[in-house]
Structures are given as structure tokens and as C-alpha cells.
Amino acid sequence: MMTSVPPRKTWWKSKKTVKVRRSYSTFPSLNAWEKFRGLLPVDGETNPGVGLGVEEGLLCQMVHSPEFNLFPNSVVFESNFVQVRRSRDWKEIYKASNTMALGVTSSVPCLPLPNILLMARVIWHQGQSQTWNRPSTVPSINLKSILPLKFVELQIWDHHERILRLRTVTEKIYFLKLHPDHPETVFRFWIRLVQILHKGLSITTKDPTILVTHCLVPKSLCSPGGKSELVQKNSKGLQPSESLTHLMAQGESEALSQIFSDLHQQKQYSSSRSEKVQINKTSSEKATPCEDSIPCTCDLNWRDAFMFGEWERENPSGPQPHSLLSTLAASSRPRLSLIGGNSI
């Protein structure tokens, strides 16, 4: 005979759990914003810079290779040129199988503007198609120069023939004609690059009253004995540019900028201290030059006016574009009616 046992009732009351759903405002990721602004290609679409042959080309692959490992996190904006010489008609110096790869990049990825120029000699095999990104047979490429853009003068020399004039600090002059396989859009990017390197972007500042930390070149340098006025007089006829040694390696360039920043701050401190001492002296005493001041080297050419911008900061405020091609395209529309000789 089966007996049914009634279930026991617990003496405590079971607590009811209520699930509370909290709603948080979701923000798109940085890559989503970059895609919305057109700075990154959408999934499934090819990068327009790769299609034009100005990004991820032979020069970029070479400097990012394990052999060089230069500026691994920076984008390289590059194109292929043919070196020509001046005459009645522009004539090619080398054979058609020899081209010059010219590109710009940044020593630090967060810089909105490039500050390094790359030059390489490319020798294509006989009968090889000169494709820029993924050639079937790797051509012979030789890296010729890595120069800071401060020591380079770049001009749009012949708009019709698509020729650039490149002059280095050693007075070496190159006339480079854009390869005929590149479309006209690529040359417009180079025109825009010359413009923004000369005038800057809207996000940059060249106001000397704004304190820019870790600036490589101080705004004003004075030499003992009052020679700064002589330097300014002698430099009026020179092209505006900036001069001081700049190391291309990222760690060394950051260390150099830190040294110049510390020297510049020390100079400001010592000059303010000397002014306080001069106030306490009698008016008959002459002010002595500061011992800690940085002397100017009068033999440096291409120094008319020191200009610096936000692209020379080690840590610019706010996120910056990661693509040089997108930086050129996102800036204001270029003025294509340029006269030969617009230089940076």
C-alpha cells in the first residue's frame, strides 16, 4: 500500500529575482568611423590607393621588409617616375627598363603629414610588365636615399609633361617624369602634396605664438655677440626652409627632438634669469651674452624663416588620419592651375 507524503513547505520565502536590463549607448569603433569618413576601404572593396599604384607598392614592401624594417607602422605614398634631362624636348636618361620609385612617409605614424622622402632605383627585367604592387617576377630595386623633407625642395616643374623637380641639400637636382602608366589622378595627388607641405592643412598650425612641445627646430635662435641680425640679413635671398640635422631612425629622431626641446626650455629659463639679474644692475653696466644660449651656425643654407607645425609634435592632439592618400583626398580641393616653380 503506497502512502503519499505531502511535500514539506520551507519556512523561508523564496526571493524573486528580477532581471534588469541596462541600456548603454553604443558607439561605433574607430575603424567604423574611418570607413564612414572614407579613410579605410570597406570590406570586399579594394583599396583605391593600391589600385592607383600609390600605396603598398614596391618601395613600401622594400622598406617594410625584414631586411630594412623601416617605419613599419607608417603608410608610404609612392609613385614610379622616369628620370629625364632638360633640353628642347625632355629626354630619358636611362633605358625604359629603369625607373625611379619616389615616395614619402612618416617617421611616426601619428603625424598627419609626411616628413621622410624615399628614393629607389628599379630595374625591370626584359619584357617584364611594370606593375607596381605584385609583379610576377621581383625586379631589382636599390634604395638610393632616405632624406628628411626639410632638406628637400620639391617643385611642380612641368604640369603638361607631369614632371617634378627635386633638389636635395647637396644641390643634387633630379627631373622626374611620372610614369605614363600612372593616371592623371596620381599627378594631381603630387600637386596636392606640394601644396599642403608648403601651406599646411587646416588641422595644423604655424602660429609661432602657440607653444608646440617637442619641436625639432626652435622658433628663434640667437648667437653670442649679436650675430643673429647678420644671419637674418644674409638669409633673405634664400629659399624658406628649415635646417638642422635630423636622424631618420624613429628612436633617434625622437631622442633628438627631446634634446632640442630640453635645450630650448633651458635657454628660455636662462634668458629670463639673466633679465632679472640685469634689472638689479646699474644702467651703466652692459648686459653680457647668455652662456647657455644656442649658437647659430651661419654657414647653414636654406634657412630664411623657421616654421613649425602640429605635424612635428611627438603626440599630436586627437586622432590623425592613418592613410597619406586619404589625407590628400580629404583635404580641400587642389588648385590645378599651378605655375611651374611652386615649391615647398
Swiss-Prot record:
Principal location listed in the UniProt entry: Golgi
GO cellular component, one term: Golgi apparatus
Compartment list: Golgi apparatus
Keyword Metal-binding: no
Superkingdom: Eukaryota
Keywords of this entry: Golgi apparatus
Gene Ontology biological-process entries: acrosome assembly; acrosome reaction
Protein's job: RAB2B effector protein required for accurate acrosome formation and normal male fertility. In complex with RAB2A/RAB2B, seems to suppress excessive vesicle trafficking during acrosome formation.
Membership in a protein family: Belongs to the GARIN family.
Protein name, per record: Golgi-associated RAB2 interactor protein 1B
Protein encoded by which gene: Garin1b
